[in-house]
């Protein structure tokens, strides 16, 4: 690859980094807004989260197109291949993060506040939302900085997220058993619990791809 072509390729890789980081920040903002809407019952804020999801979907398609163009335009060397492969994998997780924020916002639109408080898990869901939000934000920061330490911290915190999911699920199941007439609201809260657990999983996925980007190793397998 000639010097001028290499410079152009590096500029395109840098632009890819910028696009992916911007999409990640937008997804993190969607989680934050969705959880604020849940706490406050702000239906306008919830609707804005839902409306912005299409923008993140568009960003996903643009990034995927750019990755494929980079693959086709040049024969990437190992480091470039890792960067483009990481972007292709991460963009899917980021898009799903935004989808789950939108799903939480959708539930908020029809969730009855008094009924939700009666189930008794809202404070735990708020706390779990904080954990999931920080995991996502830190995973994106780990990517931007190519920071293995931050990536490892995200992966380690997944145990806390999973433990909260399990405990909240059991509390909701016990409530439904005792109050079958209130099952609909309780099931809505269970779905929020599940979406938050998935947010943690997607943050871990991103962190693992950061490790791959830096080391060429993903999980237990050397790839590139």
Task: List the predicted regions and their residue ranges.
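Cytosolic, long alpha-helical scaffolding segments
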Residues: 1-224
């Amino acid at each position: 690859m000639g010097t001028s072509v290499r410079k152009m390729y590096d500029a395109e890789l840098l632009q890819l980094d910028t696009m992916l980081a911007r999409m990640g920040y937008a997804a993190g903002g969607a989680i934050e807004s969705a959880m604020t809407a849940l706490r406050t019952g702000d239906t306008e804020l919830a609707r804005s989260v839902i409306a912005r999801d299409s923008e993140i979907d568009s960003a996903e398609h643009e990034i995927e197109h750019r990755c494929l163009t980079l693959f086709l335009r040049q024969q990437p060397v190992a480091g470039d291949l890792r960067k483009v492969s990481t972007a292709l994998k991460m963009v899917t997780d980021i898009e799903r993060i935004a989808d789950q924020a939108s799903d939480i916002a959708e539930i908020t639109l029809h969730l009855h506040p008094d009924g939700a408080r009666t189930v008794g898990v809202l404070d735990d869901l708020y706390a779990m939302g904080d954990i999931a939000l920080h995991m996502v934000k830190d995973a994106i920061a780990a990517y931007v900085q190519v920071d293995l330490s931050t990536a490892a911290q995200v992966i380690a915190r997944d145990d806390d997220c999973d433990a909260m999911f399990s405990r909240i699920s059991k509390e909701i199941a016990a409530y439904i058993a005792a109050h079958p007439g209130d099952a609909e609201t309780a099931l809505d809260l269970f779905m929020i619990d599940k979406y938050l657990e998935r947010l943690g999983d997607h943050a871990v996925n991103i962190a693992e791809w950061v490790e791959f980007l830096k080391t060429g190793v993903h999980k237990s397998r050397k790839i590139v």
